[in-house]
Amino acid sequence: NSPGAIITLLVNKIDYQLSQIAQIIESNDAKILSLYSENLESNNQIKLTIKISDSKLGAVLQTFSRYDYTVQDVFSDDEISNQGKQRYDHLMKYLNV
């Protein structure tokens, strides 16, 4: 039960390159903690469930988007919820001015 974020990707079988996915994650100073792949026969895709260190989740997600990967789900307690809280706090400060 190590801390981290879980990302679920959908990748076409013909486009699947684990080395590129690992490079995207590691180039954003995150580490792959575990990976599970599932073959989806119905739509010729592979579903990847990747647990990464939570250090730079936002940067990893932006890079996946830039490389046209389909991010199906993201599960994290820290960065995304903290970002939402920070935006809420900024809004409250603005409204108090």
What do these predicted regions represent?
Residues 1-97:
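A conserved regulatory-domain signal marking ACT and ACT-like small-molecule sensing domains
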